[in-house]
């Protein structure tokens, strides 16, 4: 019978390396922004608002992403940087992991638009921030950011909490306008700060916020990509 053995020293070192690796993974704590809200509120002015179809055509990339660690902020330009990972790409060639640039910082944020935090899921219409191909920002900031939410059955939706995109294009398939009870259900698993902001914005939005079923919007994106 042939037998092979690791020398005791090698076996011990291997076990130690595996233990350290497991400990390091378990010990990682998300890096969060110092505050989700700025010290003052700013009301942004935009040259135009985009429909979903217009934003898709104008974007360098469109993707469903998950926000990771807070990287830092640029107080001169009032922007904040986050790690982000692509979960599903609908247009463009985003790196699997990239830097997401959000308007707002610890000094100033827009009403009902808190800074992202680790775990936030988004559908974003992006442009290259600085030409590096590594940093991207939403075309008109919160106007082209849809939050990922889920209904009671676990089906995924993209929520236009400000109603600005849906107001420009009423013919997008899979569109629904949740009432307050449905909205509370959809944001039940969202972090409390964001859930409260969405609820507040929904009350202020005359047309109400709209949600799009993932499957219908993906088919719509596929059609837009062929144009």
Predicted regions and their residues:
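Sec-dependent signal peptide cleavage junction
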Residues: 21-42
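Netrin-like (NTR/C345C) domain of secreted extracellular proteins
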Residues: 27-33, 110-227
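Short boundary/loop segments of OB/S1/cold-shock single-stranded nucleic-acid-binding domains
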Residues: 39-59
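Beta-strand/loop nucleic-acid-binding surfaces
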Residues: 95-113
């Amino acid at each position: 019978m042939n037998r092979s053995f690791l020398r005791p020293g090698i076996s011990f070192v291997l076990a130690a390396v595996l233990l350290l690796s497991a400990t390091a993974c378990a010990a990682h704590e998300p890096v969060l922004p110092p505050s989700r809200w700025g010290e003052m509120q700013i009301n942004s002015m935009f040259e135009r608002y985009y429909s979903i179809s217009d934003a898709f055509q104008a974007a360098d990339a469109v993707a469903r992403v998950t926000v990771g660690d807070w990287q830092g902020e640029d107080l001169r330009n009032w922007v904040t940087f986050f790690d982000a990972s692509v979960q599903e790409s609908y247009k463009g060639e985003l790196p699997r992991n990239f830097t997401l640039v959000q308007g707002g910082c610890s000094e100033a944020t827009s009403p009902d638009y808190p800074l992202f935090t680790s775990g936030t899921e988004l559908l974003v219409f992006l442009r290259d921030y600085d030409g590096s191909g590594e940093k991207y920002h939403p075309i008109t900031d919160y106007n082209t950011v849809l939050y990922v939410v889920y209904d009671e059955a676990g089906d995924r939706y993209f929520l236009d909490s400000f109603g600005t995109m849906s107001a420009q294009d009423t013919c997008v398939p899979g569109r629904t306008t949740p009432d307050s009870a449905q909205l509370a259900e959809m944001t039940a698993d969202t972090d409390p700060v964001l859930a409260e902001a969405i609820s507040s914005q929904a009350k202020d939005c005359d047309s109400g916020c709209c949600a799009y079923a993932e499957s219908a919007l993906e088919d719509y994106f596929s059609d837009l990509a062929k144009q």
